[in-house]
UniProtKB/Swiss-Prot annotation:
<keyword id="KW-1133">Transmembrane helix</keyword>
<keyword id="KW-0472">Membrane</keyword>
<dbReference type="InterPro" id="IPR048024">
    <property type="entry name" value="Fxna-like_M28_dom"/>
</dbReference>
<keyword id="KW-0862">Zinc</keyword>
<feature type="active site" description="Proton acceptor">
    <location>
        <position position="237"/>
    </location>
</feature>
<feature type="topological domain" description="Cytoplasmic">
    <location>
        <begin position="432"/>
        <end position="467"/>
    </location>
</feature>
<keyword id="KW-0482">Metalloprotease</keyword>
<keyword id="KW-0926">Vacuole</keyword>
<dbReference type="GO" id="GO:0008235">
    <property type="term" value="F:metalloexopeptidase activity"/>
</dbReference>
<comment type="similarity">
    <text>Belongs to the peptidase M28 family.</text>
</comment>
<keyword id="KW-0812">Transmembrane</keyword>
<feature type="transmembrane region" description="Helical; Name=6">
    <location>
        <begin position="562"/>
        <end position="582"/>
    </location>
</feature>
<dbReference type="InterPro" id="IPR045175">
    <property type="entry name" value="M28_fam"/>
</dbReference>
<protein>
    <recommendedName>
        <fullName>Vacuolar membrane protease</fullName>
        <ecNumber>3.4.-.-</ecNumber>
    </recommendedName>
</protein>
<feature type="topological domain" description="Vacuolar">
    <location>
        <begin position="712"/>
        <end position="724"/>
    </location>
</feature>
<feature type="binding site">
    <location>
        <position position="203"/>
    </location>
    <ligand>
        <name>Zn(2+) 2</name>
    </ligand>
</feature>
<feature type="transmembrane region" description="Helical; Name=9">
    <location>
        <begin position="751"/>
        <end position="771"/>
    </location>
</feature>
């Protein structure tokens, strides 16, 4: 019994190994994407870490909604201070507690516990710092109307002194210059506020409890860091990264030169390395026990493809520190909803963030030389964090290893490949040609001399055009399926991304197999694998040019898979050329074939019993029909003279040549099926080397990118984004992931495409007809209720896709018989705002009860917002607004005419680091305060030129209410005040919101549409 080579280029081995290797790559990728490494079985895996304690802290912090503008937010802040004190006392640490704020405010000692002249730890309860700025640049870098912001912070900070830090209480020096203090330190940041519609378990409760455990870890005996740590629990992140910006006026501002930002942009899963400042700081993350992340996420933020921001942009872009952004990023449907709770989180996710962040913080703290000194950009307004290294390129390997290298190195690698790879192939072509073994592109050989009438066909062009035709056809079908889903059922990817992946992968595989296998069956060619390699090399070389340009000019690192792909294709293509050295020289083969034909022709003139065998003419006719190579390859039945008419041969000659063929073709060099006779000497095992070069790295890198990109964008359609983008990502990456199969797929057994065609049919039907949402993948709708305080009327607005918003509104009892008005949303492009009368579910805000019932007069809400205007005597274009809101910390002033300047009484003044005052003036002003009663006093100035200047008011003259309208006309000050109410912990407070939660379908979720859930509106 004959034993075949298990790695031979035959149907069985190719089918087996391609399936096994792809499954061995794709299954782990999916497993890592969907699961989280388990938490240690012991609650104390290392001294200084207690997971049971951390989980208890998380459940306590997330007991209620706790946005900045809520009573429960204050509870969380107090709890964090209590936990800090308990940890420090338990670890027997000398520490002090200080009240601190702006740098020009005297620091006073509030409480001392085990205090000394140089405490090991200092806790700062910052209830003094404030920050003011104006800008016309949005958080995503887009231009907006001018917006001013005033924010009063309530940040909690812990300074852990490092062994190499400056001694004493250096923050009391009173110096306002930006300088390196000692060797600098490491900032670890998380925010303790949640959105009004979510409990904040992962956004950002896990970040907060991770910092508490980091405090426990580094204050445990023997764990003092080298460079000091500054642990920051900031407040107000959800309303515009406000807590981080308030740190600008902290006396500790200049100390940290590096940072680790802990965030949640999803609701569980693994914590991904979202962004990093540069290569050097990214190497700190290499120490992580379970690294997870890729540079594509960072480039997505840089290019504005990710429509959200984290505090990273403040630390890195504005303050100039260098650091890491570690965040949860999926599942996005639970983000900012009531499912961001501990029920839908897990200790494993908490451990993943905690263990990785501790490793990164320790590595940054131990590095005492890299991250301090003069900046490369010379910006004196930013922290001196040393010269930035090259932008980093990074990706994890199955959640275990982590590769980091510089973008400059990647560019050098790309440039080298662009020059060297085609040069080496050209040299190989030259050598093969010199040795007369370049079978590629060879049609025929003239045995005697050029112009001979009896050339021998080589068939070297056969298979040349198959790849572009096959990929063009298969790729077009795959891309067409993306447009089909976008047209018929655009939201299906929201909950069923794997069904979409399965449909497009199977479609491309089946169509590619049909075209390449079909052409190979009709006209077999031993060079098909080599020609496909040549085509792939050319395409990847062209892509590499684009990647090199983006690396050099745009500093985009996401093209690294193309560099790896081209490297693998280059080596694999080299193998295809080296295989030709095993063949006989073309002229030697042609002479031998020519001589064999002559012998057979002479023998064919003799009568023989085999003359009764009919000639095999149909195969000859079939070969004539192939347009790729008009010449026959020489076989024992080919006429000596190329192009001669075989009909002149006798039946005896044809029959004898058939017998001669069977006797003269030894099995040792027998070609595969009906491929060219000379191909029998090609090695049959080299294909597995090529496949191992092409498939693993390509599938791993592109598979990671595909899974991450789809997870990050699949919910974008619900927010008004283009769903086509997500489908095109899946379609293109399906092509890229499977294209390494192209050189070998014509040897795959037909059972595989039959099975995949059935999978395609099933997933196609499902994707076209299935409802796109479910209880585990809820559609997110944005809620806000607005009150006109002048007449007490109220309306509820739900923002989302028209079709689904109407379905939800129809389920709400209070909407029965109400008129629903829908208009295109101004705030969220692609969505609609659907409003209805909210009088049946009026908000019960401060003072809204009379004798235990909701008041129904049109004056019931007038007390919520108050504004008093005083006009300056020295200028008709200056005035002062005193604004207050009952039981709210947040208001927004919208001016009818932009103001050229504003100042908040008691503020630090405009901070130019956070934005330049818009030339066109400020059209709206956002106001945040830390208490519930102190009014905002705002001085404003307006003129035609909208010039920026100081506001210096003289004697003020009060203006009574009857004169307000006259003041609007004469002085030009008028507008609207919207105050915000965010506390939905008591259902009766905002019954419209709780009605939505209670009565809407289980596939619907609700998130805040504005700073608050309710906004009373008052004209002034």
């Amino acid at each position: 019994m004959k034993c075949h080579n298990p790695f031979g280029f035959r149907v069985g081995p190719v089918t087996f190994w391609t399936i096994i290797i792809y499954l061995a790559l794709l299954v782990p990728l999916l497993w890592i994407h969907e699961t989280v490494p388990p938490a240690p079985s012991s609650p104390t895996p290392t001294p200084g870490i207690n997971l049971t304690e951390a989980w208890h802290d998380l459940t306590t912090i997330t007991k209620h909604y706790h946005p900045y503008n809520s009573r429960d937010n204050e509870r969380v802040g107090d709890y964090i201070l209590e936990r800090i004190a308990a940890i420090l006392d338990r670890n027997d640490v000398n520490w002090t507690l200080e009240k601190t704020g702006a740098r020009n405010v005297d620091v006073t000692l509030e409480l001392s516990s085990r205090s000394s002249s140089a405490p090991s730890v200092t806790v700062f309860d910052d209830n003094l710092a404030n920050v003011t700025w104006a800008t016309d640049i949005g958080m995503l870098g887009d231009h907006t109307a001018g917006v001013g912001t005033y924010f009063e912070g309530t940040n909690k900070l812990v300074y852990i002194r490092g062994t190499e830090d400056e001694q004493g209480e250096w923050w009391k020096s009173g110096k306002n210059d930006v300088r390196v203090i000692g060797k600098g330190g490491v900032l670890v940041n998380a925010h303790y506020d949640s959105v009004a519609s979510g409990y904040g378990a992962t956004d950002d409760g896990m970040g907060c409890v991770s910092i508490l455990q980091i405090l426990n870890y580094f204050t445990t005996q023997g764990r003092q860091p080298k460079r000091g740590l500054l642990l920051l629990f900031n407040n107000g992140e959800e309303d515009g990264l406000l807590g981080a910006k308030a740190f600008a006026n902290s006396p500790l501002f200049s100390f940290p030169t590096t940072f680790v930002n802990l965030e949640g942009a999803g609701a569980g899963g693994r914590a991904v390395l979202f962004r990093s400042s540069d290569e050097q700081v990214t190497k700190a993350y290499q120490k992580a026990p379970h690294p997870f992340g890729l540079v594509v996420a960072s480039d997505g933020f840089s290019m504005g493809l990710v429509k959200s921001q984290t505090d990273f942009v403040v630390w890195d872009d504005i303050f100039g520190q260098r650091g890491l952004d570690i965040a949860f990023y999926r599942p996005r449907p639970r983000y900012h909803t009531d499912q961001d709770d501990t029920r839908h989180a897990s200790p494993a996710s908490l451990w993943h963030m905690l263990s990785n962040s501790i490793a990164a913080v320790k590595s940054l703290s131990d590095n005492t030389h890299t991250f301090s000194g003069q900046r490369s950009d010379g910006d004196r307004r930013k922290v001196p964090s040393g010269s930035h290294a090259s932008k980093g390129v990074w990706f994890d390997m199955f959640g275990k290893g982590f590769a980091v290298f510089g973008l400059r190195g990647l560019f050098a690698w790309s440039l080298t490949l662009l020059i060297v790879s085609p040069l080496i192939l050209a040299i190989l072509v030259f050598i093969l040609n010199r040795h007369d073994k370049l079978y590629f592109f060879s049609r025929k050989i003239n045995v005697h001399n050029e112009g001979s009438e009896d050339p021998v066909s080589i068939g070297g062009f056969r298979g040349f055009t198959r790849f572009p035709i096959a990929v063009g056809f298969s790729g077009a079908l795959t891309l067409a399926s993306a447009f089909l889903l976008t047209k018929i059922n655009p939201m299906i990817v929201y909950s069923s991304e794997y069904a979409v992946w399965g449909m497009m992968l199977s479609l491309f595989y089946v169509s590619l197999w049909m075209t390449l296998k079909g052409s190979s069956a009709v006209r077999p060619s031993a060079l098909q694998r080599g020609y496909i390699h040549i085509w792939l090399f050319i395409v990847s070389w062209g892509l590499l040019i684009v990647v090199a340009v983006t690396e050099d000019r745009l500093k985009i690192a996401s093209g690294y898979p193309v560099v790896f792909l081209h490297s693998a294709l280059f080596l694999s293509t080299v193998i295809s050329f080296l295989e030709l050295f095993g063949l006989t020289k073309k002229h030697d083969y042609a002479r031998r074939a020519h001589d064999d034909h002559q012998v057979r022709d002479r023998i064919g003139e003799l009568p023989h019993d085999d003359a009764l065998i009919a000639p095999d003419t149909p195969n000859d006719e079939a070969e004539d029909s192939d347009g790729e190579d008009s010449e026959h390859e020489p076989t024992e039945t080919t006429p000596l003279r190329a192009g001669g008419d075989s009909r002149v041969r006798s039946t005896f000659g044809t029959a004898y040549r058939s017998v001669f063929t069977r006797k003269s073709s030894p099995d040792k060099h027998k070609p595969f099926e009906n491929e060219q006779p000379w191909s029998g000497r090609l090695p049959g095992w080299t294909w597995i080397l090529q496949f191992l070069l092409l498939a693993p790295i390509n599938v791993i890198l592109w598979g990671q990118i595909g899974l991450f990109a789809v997870a990050a964008t699949q919910a974008g359609g619900a927010d008004g984004g283009s769903v086509l983008t997500t489908y095109l990502i899946i379609a293109v990456l399906s092509i890229v992931i499977l294209v390494p199969l192209a050189p070998f797929i014509h040897r795959v057994h037909y059972y595989v495409p039959i099975i995949l065609f059935a999978a395609f049919a099933g997933t196609l039907i499902y994707n076209l007809i299935a409802f796109p949402f479910s209880a585990n993948n809820r559609y997110k709708i944005y809620f806000v209720q607005e009150i006109d305080v002048s007449d007490g009327s109220t309306k509820v607005s739900l923002t989302g896709l028209d079709k689904y918003v109407h379905s939800v509104i129809g389920e709400l009892p209070s909407t029965s018989g109400k008129v629903i008005t829908c208009t295109d949303s101004n705030a969220r492009s692609g969505l609609v705002d659907c409003s209805y009368d909210g009088s049946a579910v009026p908000p019960l805000l401060h003072g809204g009860l009379e004798n235990g019932t909701v008041t129904v007069t049109n004056k019931r809400y007038q007390h919520l917002v108050s504004v008093n205007i005083t006009r300056s005597n020295d200028s008709k274009n200056r005035a002062t607004l005193s604004i207050n809101a009952a039981d709210s910390k947040v208001c927004t002033v919208i001016f009818d005419q932009p103001v050229s300047n504003f100042a908040i009484r008691g503020s630090e003044g405009l901070d130019s680091r956070l934005g330049q005052y818009p030339d066109a003036g400020v059209g709206s002003l956002r106001l945040f305060r830390r208490d519930w009663t102190s009014p905002w006093v705002v001085d404003v100035e307006w003129n035609d030129q909208h010039k920026v200047g100081e506001v210096a008011l003289e004697t003020d003259k009060p203006v009574d209410k009857d004169a307000v309208e006259e003041l609007r006309k004469r002085a030009g000050i008028s507008g609207t005040i919207k105050c915000h109410y965010s506390d939905a912990n008591v259902p009766e407070t905002i019954p419209a919101f709780h009605e939505c939660l209670q009565y809407s379908p289980d596939w619907a979720a609700f998130s805040k549409a504005d700073v608050g859930l309710v906004r009373p509106v008052k004209r002034f």
